[in-house]
């Protein structure tokens, strides 16, 4: 039987040209985030199935790659349901593993803990542009910091990185889960229906206010509640004035500190930012994960046509491991989507230095080859990237191929002439 050469559906092979950009971006991520005090950590890509199915991951829990029990623990004939056959799965994000990691190692970590976590995650999703079943995710999280300083630092660190990658005119959309709930409560929606309301609200970009109105009506909600709810969205602006409007409008159902903190985050980021972007209050921003408890944010880029990153505060998640809540806030960038955008725009890694190719005639005597190897080693010590290859018959094609890899200078060595 002939083996299959193509990767499994939803996976991809990464060629050297893309790998060079990926390596550069990862290096820049580490360099930039460490300037903000984040430190690297790692957790296994395999997690307990109980942790992955704890109703914290939203729709991602439907996309888990489950791992069968092994050996004596695997009793297929006695299994009554799927979970009787599995005890672990591949992580679908980095947040659940981070919370388990922190819960297990908190006594050995600084407080607050500023974590940088880069690694592959896995989702049995439908592949599409910029979306794969295995993909790299890059998260920064601040654990143990209850104030809005965490949100400010996360937004500034992430936007500084994007600025270094020559991204401009993007938008950080920001909202707060408490504002979402207060708006729904003020409008008269029953608390048990909030999630349904938010799922419909999340479609605002695609179906508009009228579409949201129609879907809410189809769900059987009162017309008065729908009109009150959507009337606020017509009045709210995307700046600090919009936050102040919400603070006044919802004063009977919303702690004023929620709006005041959000205003401080927006004003602080605007005053300090170094990258070219705007931060915009967006009361329609929902974010799919149920574990968010406070401010939430998302990166919107017109050239991608959607989100390329996001995050928020999740103060109640670590408590599910320890029994005691710990303040936590994180921001994840869409690493694969950002690399895809860089490739599409023909991005070149800066400062790669000179790349030189030594082409050696076939059957070069050992003593002469040694001389060439010493010469190459000397150039490498001086900072030049040197590759050594045997000269092919079609030398022109060989050079053209190497030029696509960035080699700009070629040195030819022959047996009778060095």
Segments from the language model and where they lie:
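Hydrophobic mid-domain F-helix/FG-region of cytochrome P450s
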Residues: 157-164, 178-186
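TRNA-binding/sensing appendages of the translation machinery
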Residues: 1-92, 96, 152-156, 173
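Short, surface-exposed recognition loops or helix-turn segments adjacent to catalytic cores
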Residues: 169-178, 197, 280-286
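Short, conserved phosphate-binding/catalytic loop or strand-edge motifs used
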Residues: 132-138, 174-182
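Short Asp/Glu-rich motifs
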Residues: 52-53, 181, 203, 398
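Short low-complexity, flexible loop/linker segments enriched in glycine and/or proline
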Residues: 55-59, 186-188, 295, 402-404
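Acidic, His- and aromatic-enriched active-site or binding-groove loops in soluble protein domains
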Residues: 60-76, 188-212
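Positively charged, Gly/Ser-enriched RNA/tRNA-binding surfaces
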Residues: 18-36, 47-48, 82-85, 93-107, ...
């Amino acid at each position: 039987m002939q083996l299959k050469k193509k990767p499994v559906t939803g996976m991809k092979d990464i060629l050297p040209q893309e790998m060079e950009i990926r390596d550069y971006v990862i290096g820049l991520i580490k360099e930039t985030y460490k300037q903000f005090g984040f430190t690297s950590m790692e957790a296994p890509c395999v997690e307990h199935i109980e942790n992955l199915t704890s109703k914290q991951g939203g729709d991602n829990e439907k996309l888990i790659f489950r791992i069968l029990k092994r050996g004596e623990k695997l009793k297929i004939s006695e299994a009554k349901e799927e979970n009787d056959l599995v005890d672990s799965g591949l992580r679908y994000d980095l947040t659940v593993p981070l919370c388990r990691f922190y819960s297990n190692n908190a006594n050995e970590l600084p407080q607050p803990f500023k974590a940088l976590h880069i690694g592959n995650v896995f989702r049995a999703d439908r592949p599409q542009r910029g979306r794969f079943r295995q993909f790299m995710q890059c998260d920064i999280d601040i654990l143990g910091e209850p104030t809005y300083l965490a949100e400010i630092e996360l937004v500034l660190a992430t936007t500084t990185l994007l600025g270094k990658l020559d991204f401009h005119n993007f938008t950080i959309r920001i909202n707060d889960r408490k504002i979402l709930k207060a708006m729904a409560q003020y409008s008269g929606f029953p608390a048990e229906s909030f999630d349904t309301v938010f799922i419909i609200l999340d479609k605002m970009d695609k179906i508009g206010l009228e579409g949201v109105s129609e879907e809410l009506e189809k769900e059987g909600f009162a017309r008065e509640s729908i009109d009150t709810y959507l009337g606020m969205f017509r009045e709210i602006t995307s700046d600090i004035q919009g936050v102040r409007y919400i603070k006044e409008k919802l004063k009977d159902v919303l702690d004023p500190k929620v709006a005041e903190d959000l205003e401080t985050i927006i004003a602080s980021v605007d005053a300090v930012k170094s990258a070219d972007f705007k931060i915009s209050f967006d009361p329609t921003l929902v974010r799919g994960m149920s574990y968010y408890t406070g401010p939430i944010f998302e990166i919107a880029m017109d050239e991608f046509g959607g989100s390329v990153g996001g995050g928020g505060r999740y103060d109640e998640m670590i408590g599910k491991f320890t029994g005691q809540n710990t303040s936590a806030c994180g921001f994840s960038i869409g690493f694969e989507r950002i690399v895809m955008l860089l490739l599409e725009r023909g991005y070149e890694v800066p400062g790669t230095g000179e790349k030189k190719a030594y082409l050696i005639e076939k059957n070069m005597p050992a003593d002469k080859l040694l001389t060439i190897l010493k010469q190459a080693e000397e150039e490498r010590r001086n900072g030049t990237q040197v590759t050594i290859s045997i000269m092919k018959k079609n030398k022109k094609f060989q050079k053209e191929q190497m030029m696509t890899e960035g080699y700009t200078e070629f040195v030819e060595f022959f047996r009778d002439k060095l």
